[in-house]
Regions:
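Extracytoplasmic
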Residues: 20, 87, 91-198
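Juxtamembrane segments of multi-pass membrane proteins
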Residues: 1-81
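Short secondary-structure transition/capping segments
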Residues: 53-60, 83-97
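Low-complexity, compositionally biased segments
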Residues: 69-71, 85, 130
Length: 198
C-alpha cells in the first residue's frame, strides 16, 4: 500500500537537456537505503520496455511502433536536418539514435503539419503516446530545467535527513559541476530553517 503520509518527497531540479546525466543521478540515488523510489523522465517506461529517454535507432523505432522502416528512416533524417545534425544524414542514419520521447513528439508534429500520414491504428497509438508523453514532460521538464522526484524513507527533519539532502545535492553537483541545481521539499525547508537559527 502506498501511503503518502509516510513518504518524504524531495524534488531535485537540474538543467534540462541531458537525459543520460539524469538517468545516472537517478540510478545512483536508487542505491541509497534512504531512497524508497525516484521518478524522472529517464526512468518512466514508455512502451515496449523502453524508458521515455532511451535512445532508439530508426530500426528500433520502426519495430516498436510498427512504422515502415523507410518511413522511420525518413523521419530520422528529417529530425537530424531539423537539429542541424547533417553528418548523421551523410554518414548514415542506421546508427543514429534519438531519445524515444523526442522522436515521438517530432513524429506528432510532422503528422500535424501533414508531412507524414499514418494508418488509423498507428495514429491512435501516436495520439495516446503524445498525450502521455506531453503530460510527463509538463510535470518533469521545462525549457530550462528537469525535475526528478525522490521519495525518501527518512523523516522530514533530523540530522540524518539533513545529511542526506547534502548527499543528494552533492550527487547532482557531480554531474552538473558549476551549474545551478536545486533541491526542494519539506526536508530542505526544515534544514534551511534550522541552519538560520544555528
Amino acid at each position: 500500500d502506498y501511503n503518502f503520509s509516510t513518504k518524504n518527497l524531495m524534488a531535485l531540479v537540474v538543467p534540462a537537456g541531458d537525459y543520460d546525466k539524469e538517468r545516472a543521478i537517478l540510478d545512483e540515488l536508487e542505491q541509497y537505503d534512504e531512497v524508497d523510489s525516484t521518478l524522472g523522465l529517464s526512468n518512466v517506461e514508455a512502451m515496449g520496455g523502453y524508458m521515455l529517454t532511451d535512445r532508439l535507432t530508426p530500426r528500433q523505432f520502426s519495430e516498436l511502433t510498427d512504422l515502415d522502416y523507410e518511413v522511420a528512416e525518413f523521419l530520422y533524417g528529417a529530425y537530424a536536418a531539423n537539429h542541424e545534425n547533417y553528418g548523421k544524414i551523410v554518414g548514415g542514419l542506421s546508427t543514429y539514435s534519438v531519445p524515444l520521447i523526442d522522436m515521438f513528439l517530432f513524429l506528432y508534429d510532422e503528422v500535424q503539419q501533414g508531412y507524414v500520414t499514418l494508418d488509423d491504428e498507428l495514429q491512435s497509438t501516436l495520439d495516446d503516446a503524445y498525450t502521455q508523453m506531453t503530460n510527463a514532460k509538463l510535470q518533469l521538464q521545462s525549457e530550462q530545467y528537469s525535475r526528478m522526484l525522490i521519495y525518501s524513507t527518512l523523516p522530514v527533519s533530523g540530522d540524518e535527513t539533513y545529511a542526506f539532502t547534502d548527499t543528494v545535492t552533492a550527487i547532482a553537483q557531480k554531474y552538473y559541476p558549476g551549474e545551478k541545481v536545486y533541491l526542494a521539499g519539506d526536508s530542505t525547508n526544515e534544514y534551511e530553517f534550522e541552519k538560520s537559527f544555528a
